[in-house]
Amino acid sequence: NLFQFGEMIFEKTGKEAVHSYAIYGCYCGWGGQGRAMDATDRCCFVHDCCYGRVNGCNPKMATYSTSFQNGDIVCGDNDLCLRAVCECDRAAAICLGQNVNTYNKNYEHYSISHCMEESEQC
């Protein structure tokens, strides 16, 4: 769920998810359109695509089993749907962590009205 995803983001970036990523670029946060603004925003685009491939559950609300071990995020569900959601969140958190050095404060609270280019396909 979004709370667990936020914990993963904090674990990998040291940033508080809601403040730093809830309205970042064209894809971080609810929905998305246009072209990703940078590598961080691209992580969110890929995450949106991943959620789009998860069928049969509500990825934003699904509560899954996860733990943090030696700096890694471990998804522990046997339920295929919950595990898929966890893996989407895990991959995005890792991606955000790998791109934290290029995080651009100019894209915080970015207006979706600036995201008018044709959207990429997943």
UniProtKB/Swiss-Prot annotation:
One Gene Ontology term of the biological-process aspect is: lipid catabolic process
Which EC number(s) are documented for this chain?
Answer: 3.1.1.4
Question: Known Pfam families for this protein?
Answer: Phospholip_A2_1
Cofactors named for this entry: Ca(2+)
**Got a GO cellular component term for this one?**
extracellular region
Q: Which residues bind Ca(2+)?
A: Y27, G29, G31, D48
Tell me the active site.
H47, D89
Does the keyword field hold Ion transport?
A: no
Write out the similarity annotation.
Belongs to the phospholipase A2 family. Group II subfamily. D49 sub-subfamily.
**Annotated signal peptide:** none
User: Between which residues do disulfide bridges form?
Assistant: C26-C115, C28-C44, C43-C95, C49-C122, C50-C88, C57-C81, C75-C86
Role description: Heterodimer: presynaptic neurotoxin. Monomer: Snake venom phospholipase A2 (PLA2) is inactive towards micellar phosphatidylcholine but is weakly active towards non-micellar dithiolecithin. PLA2 catalyzes the calcium-dependent hydrolysis of the 2-acyl groups in 3-sn-phosphoglycerides.
This chain belongs to the protein called: Acidic phospholipase A2 CbIalpha
Provide the catalytic activity annotation.
a 1,2-diacyl-sn-glycero-3-phosphocholine + H2O = a 1-acyl-sn-glycero-3-phosphocholine + a fatty acid + H(+)
